[in-house]
Regions:
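Phosphate- and other anionic-substrate recognition elements at nucleic-acid/protein interfaces
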Residues: 1-171
Length: 171
């Protein structure tokens, strides 16, 4: 797991850097934060015992993130409503996509044929993103965190923060 540093600043001044939070939704959810340069800042997997515990934790997850300008989610749309409620209150754009959206952009057709192959490929690509972002290599990487990393990569490309998939990550 990467260091959980949520405060990112622009080098030229003291304004918060734009950030994008990607979430693989579930009671075991993956989280990945990207900076305005399109690089991964941190990632993690969090487990919540039930929906009530998740709902209570959302404020604590979002509050320390400086410059949060977008939340991109994939997965359980009912759980997405919990995140969206706070995002709407704080006027942070929030979007929910299907897995097929980021998989189509980032994975080869043959890697999309089964969920298991897609998850294995996501793990490999997420590790490449971690390395490209100059973060320490994980000893283990949960599939929800790996998928959040790729959801976020899709998001920063869509936001125009990156022109495309970095060569170090491309398949």
């Amino acid at each position: 797991m990467a260091a959980d540093q949520t405060s990112t600043r622009n080098e030229d001044d003291d304004t918060p850097e734009e950030t994008l939070l990607a979430i693989d939704l579930g009671l075991r959810c993956g989280l990945a934060l990207y900076g305005g340069d399109g690089r991964l800042r941190w990632y993690r997997s969090s487990h919540f015992a039930n929906r009530a515990q998740l709902k209570k934790a959302i404020y604590g997850i979002l509050r320390p993130i400086d410059g949060l300008s977008m939340i991109l989610m994939e997965g359980d749309r009912e759980l997405a409503t919990f995140w969206r409620k706070l995002a709407d209150k704080w006027e942070i754009p929030c979007k929910t996509i299907g897995a097929e959206v980021w998989r189509e952009q980032l994975l080869l057709k043959r890697e999309q044929t089964s969920g298991q192959v897609a998850k294995e490929t996501a793990d490999q690509m997420a590790r490449a993103v971690i390395s490209w972002s100059d973060l320490p290599s994980p000893t283990s990487l949960r599939h929800d965190a790996a998928e959040a990393i790729l959801i976020g990569l899709h998001g920063v490309i869509e936001q125009g923060w990156l022109e495309g998939v970095p060569d170090a990550v491309a398949r």
